[in-house]
Design a protein with these regions (language model features):
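Carbohydrate transferase catalytic cores enriched for Leloir-type hexosyltransferases
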Residues: 1-370
Length: 370
């Protein structure tokens, strides 16, 4: 069978969650499947992270905007290649496409109420696009894939889909993520010493950046050690604005804002952290949880949405809407060495349940059933 896979953004330099998911899936399919023929549709970019192989063809499709690329250029390219099944991997798909569709619907956050603060223009436009497209394509899709039981139940309840249309397939994590010895050359690009708290921030309200910074300020008031906080995926000006809004500018000297951290550096960043804070209000899966655990790092995460499902009892669970709950867990990890050690060991064991090979094998089952 000729299978097309939409992977529009994997050639861009700064990749994020869904980009890595489809990239890892493609890599595994290249390894394990020699029967089907694959056409990987990408937008041109600087990072040629996958190459064509005997039965896997990388097709660069040029188009200036995301909607036009997906709605016009992608179905045209798929038709030219004789694709018999098109897998769209990032929540949306062409509305007018005669090729049988499989859609990975990571979440339906775009159908839920907005956060308490406005998102960026880019985020708002993306939300509007998904709200317009998904209802139009959902019935046309032969199968919907999602990434956790939490999200599967959420999708079924809100979209009223027929039984069996949604298939849950867990994500994996890259085995590149493993415990690393301290490397001053790598760590020094971002922070000057190890044993910091590490937090992946964002302006998206679901990432809970404001409340996590509030929790850190409470931690500093009570801690004797007063570890620094390394914040990634957010601009310094945005952190400064939050601190100013809450009258916390005095803690700025303890916060290091790293911006975007290269994926190749992340194993070192996780490994040298005292703990990883993944305190989102809402996640559909949470690959960073597994990455941190695989690097031997204690994880503080939320007791909401998919995070307890993915972490199990192998992370320190907190109420993400309560800054005091987050702060107290940071302090507990600092003052209770046995507890922290148990979280590290249990986290390492938990990661053994997840792999991209398992994900790819289940994908093949979906393709064969359509």
């Amino acid at each position: 069978m000729k299978i097309g896979i939409e992977a529009q953004r994997i050639f861009r330099h700064k990749k994020h969650g869904m980009d890595f998911v489809v990239l890892e899936e493609i890599k595994q399919l290249q390894k394990i499947d020699k029967r089907n023929e694959y056409f990987i549709f990408v937008k041109p970019g600087p990072d040629h992270c996958i190459k064509s192989s005997v039965n896997c063809h990388v097709i660069e499709v040029k188009c200036p905007s995301y909607p036009l690329w997906e709605q016009v250029a992608l179905p045209r390219a798929a038709k030219r290649c004789g694709v018999e099944l098109l897998h769209c991997t990032s929540n949306t798909a062409p509305m007018f496409c005669n090729i049988p569709l499989v859609l990975t619907l990571h979440d339906i956050i775009f159908l839920e109420p907005r956060g308490s603060h406005n998102k960026s223009l880019y985020q708002n436009l993306g939300r509007l696009y998904r709200r317009m497209v998904v209802p139009q394509i959902i019935e046309k899709c032969r199968r919907i894939i999602t990434v956790s039981h939490f999200e599967e139940e959420n999708i079924n309840n809100k979209l009223c889909l027929p039984p069996g249309k949604v298939t849950m397939i867990y994500n994996g994590y890259n085995e590149w993520f493993s415990k690393r010895n301290y490397d001053a050359n790598v760590i020094g690009r971002y922070i000057d010493a190890p044993d910091y708290f590490f937090f992946l921030g964002n302006t998206d309200p679901k990432k809970n950046t404001e409340r996590t910074l509030l929790a850190y300020s409470q931690y500093l008031l009570k801690s004797k050690v007063k570890r620094r906080l390394l914040v990634a995926d957010i601009k310094a000006a945005e952190v400064d604005a939050i601190l100013k809004r809450y009258g916390m500018s005095y803690i700025r000297e303890k916060i290091v804002v790293a911006g975007y951290i290269k994926n190749s550096d992340l194993p070192h960043i996780y490994s040298s952290a005292f703990a990883f804070l993944y305190t989102s209000l809402r996640e559909s899966f949470g690959i960073p949880l597994l990455e941190a655990m695989a690097c031997g790092t204690a994880v503080v995460t939320s007791n909401t949405s998919s995070m307890p499902e993915i972490a199990g009892s192998n992370a320190a669970l907190v109420n993400p809407e309560d800054a005091d709950s987050i702060a107290m867990m940071m302090l507990k990890l600092e003052t209770d060495g046995d507890f922290r050690s148990s979280m590290i060991e249990q986290g390492l064991q938990r990661t053994r349940l997840f792999s991209w090979r398992n994900t790819a094998e289940q994908l093949l089952g979906v393709y064969a059933s359509v």
